[in-house]
């Protein structure tokens, strides 16, 4: 059961690597950086509060792990509304849980024996290393197009994280990393126990159950997903077909419609073995699509055409709306005389906010080569 204690540790184990002060401190730095830069005010507040007396907190976690007494407190399920879609089932865990989960991730990613299970040249999401992430994925798509791909199918694995067969993935890891104490800690770190199930009501069914699913919002979830889809990545590449995957989004490229559709069918069969499925590209929704490469297509927030990469129209519209929201808020001052004394300061804050939005968006799409779109 989640929250249970774990056995005492033995020497020279993966478990010992997790509970070293060095690993915990490195894990905290990542948790702090992610939290303090979050767009959620509550997340920033929680991280700031935890940072007060951080050495005391880390020492407590270290000693609890060392004695096998660390417990993962229950998390909260947050259904994030999405227009025209089911809510996104985000799991918000306490800071100490995030620190230990991040420490476990650091140890897993530093285990050479595990790399063949998740480091594939066409998989880019949730993998530590240079040239990965969205830029690496989109650039590889563009390379396949320039190499002669004529047809594509893009799709999204439906409810991926909440349907991952966790026990199967943990068994794969156990087959490579022989350390019972570490395996026990990993199982508890990836279990999802929510303390607000009654509040969630009907939305509770969107969240992971005991054996199926991992938490959206947990740093370990992308790695577990990549390990599960090892065979998907390997079997869908070759014989003229390229399949680029970023977590649950993927695009299949090939020389003609027949071969690409056959590859997609094979992919569905592989996913079905794990109780997963992908959206139907024939419906041409935001989640999936198919067609000739020469007409262009969207993938990971980018528009890809032969030799040209640019931010997708939806992404461009989103940044304009973000700037407009900031400007609209500043205009409230003009209608409230009692706030006019602060107008100069507010104007500076507004300009700084707009600059930050544009800089962040520009950095996000700096790898795009369609300069005309970027100038707009």
Predicted feature locations:
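Non-catalytic, polymerase-adjacent accessory regions of viral genome-replication enzymes
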Residues: 1-64
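Short, conserved non-catalytic motifs in the polymerase core
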Residues: 40-48, 73-99, 116-130, 197-224
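Acidic/histidine-rich catalytic neighborhood
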Residues: 277-311
């Amino acid at each position: 059961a989640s929250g249970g204690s774990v056995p005492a540790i033995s020497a020279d184990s993966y478990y010992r690597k997790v509970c070293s002060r060095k690993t915990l401190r490195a894990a905290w730095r990542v948790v702090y950086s992610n939290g303090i830069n979050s767009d959620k005010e509550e997340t920033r507040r929680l991280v700031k509060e935890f940072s007060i007396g951080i050495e005391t907190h880390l020492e407590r976690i270290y000693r609890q792990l060392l004695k096998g007494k660390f417990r993962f407190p229950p998390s909260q399920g947050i259904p994030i509304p999405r227009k025209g879609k089911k809510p996104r089932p985000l799991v918000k865990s306490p800071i100490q849980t995030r620190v230990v989960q991040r420490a476990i991730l650091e140890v897993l990613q530093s285990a050479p024996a595990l790399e063949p299970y998740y480091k594939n040249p066409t998989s880019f999401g949730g993998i530590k290393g240079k040239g990965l992430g969205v830029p690496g994925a989109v650039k590889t798509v563009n390379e396949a197009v320039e190499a002669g791909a004529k047809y594509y199918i893009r799709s999204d694995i439906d409810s991926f994280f909440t349907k991952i067969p966790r026990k199967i993935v943990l068994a794969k890891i156990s087959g490579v990393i022989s350390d019972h104490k570490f395996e026990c800690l990993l199982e508890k770190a990836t279990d999802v126990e929510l303390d607000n199930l009654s509040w969630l009501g009907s939305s509770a069914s969107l969240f992971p159950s005991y054996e199926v699913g991992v938490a959206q919002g947990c740093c370990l979830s992308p790695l577990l997903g990549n390990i599960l889809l090892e065979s998907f990545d390997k079997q869908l590449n070759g014989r003229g077909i390229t399949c680029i995957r970023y977590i649950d989004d993927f695009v299949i490229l090939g020389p003609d419609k027949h071969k690409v559709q056959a590859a997609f069918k094979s992919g569905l069969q592989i996913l079905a073995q794990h109780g997963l499925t992908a959206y139907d590209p024939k419906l041409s929704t935001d989640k999936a699509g198919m067609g000739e490469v020469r007409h262009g297509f969207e993938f990971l927030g980018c528009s890809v055409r032969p030799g040209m990469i640019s931010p997708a129209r939806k992404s461009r519209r989103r940044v304009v709306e973000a700037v407009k929201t900031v400007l609209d808020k500043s205009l409230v001052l003009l209608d409230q005389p009692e706030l006019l004394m602060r107008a100069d300061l507010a104007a500076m804050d507004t300009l700084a906010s707009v600059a930050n939005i544009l800089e962040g968006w520009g950095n996000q799409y700096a790898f795009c080569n369609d300069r005309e779109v970027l100038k707009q």
